[in-house]
Amino acid sequence: PGLFRIAKLYIGEIENRYLTGEVRRKVIYHLYKLPQVTINNEKVLLHDGETFEIDGIKIECFLVPGHTWGHMVYLIDDKYLFTGDTLWFGADGGYSFISSLAESNKLAVKSLAALEQKLQSRDLHPLFLTGHTGWTDNFEFAFAHKDKLCSPFKKRVPDPTAPYDAYDESDDTEKMAKSGFLKGVGR
């Protein structure tokens, strides 16, 4: 079961095909198929460009295929862009997400460039919140390497401000986070 067993699931119509079994997720350059995930929650299927509200919060959906065939990012109140696995932030800027995990690297790079254009055409400069590598409010930093993939096999520029992750995490508390211990990247 779990904490969210009765929660309504908002998911892109294309992404939902992974949950129905119509499509199987392939990783490590398509050498390995992930097991099917089944979720029995009530679902609301979303489409590219769709805007809806939940409790007065505006949510806009942008289809950015590549990492998965139906990967979406969500713009909240024109201020916050939840990018999931679309962007990977290195110390020197944003890249298209990890190449070995993409359904199509070429499509991922193309989608990232299209996302940048959509935001620029509307003069939007949201806070970018990634699924794995933090956040930034620096638009140029977020798209610095939009035409490049984050490769798990190439040396990346180290981030001297990134916390070392092999330590006792007892100090990783809400108080420490609010005190400024955790900073956005590219600022």
Which sequence ranges carry the predicted segments?
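Short, well-ordered coil/turn elements that cap or connect secondary structure elements
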Residues: F4-I6, I54-G56, D123
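Well-ordered beta-strand scaffold positions
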Residues: I14, E50, I57, K79-Y80
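Active-site HxH/HxHxD metal-binding segment of metal-dependent hydrolases
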Residues: P1-T51, D147-K148, P152-Y167
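Intrinsically disordered, low-complexity Ser/Thr/Pro-rich tracts
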Residues: L46-G49, G56-I57, L63
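A general structural signal for short secondary-structure boundary/capping elements
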Residues: L34-T38, F128-H132, K175-F181
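Metallo-beta-lactamase
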Residues: K58-P65, W69-F153, D159-P160
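C-terminal regulatory/interaction regions
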Residues: T161-R187
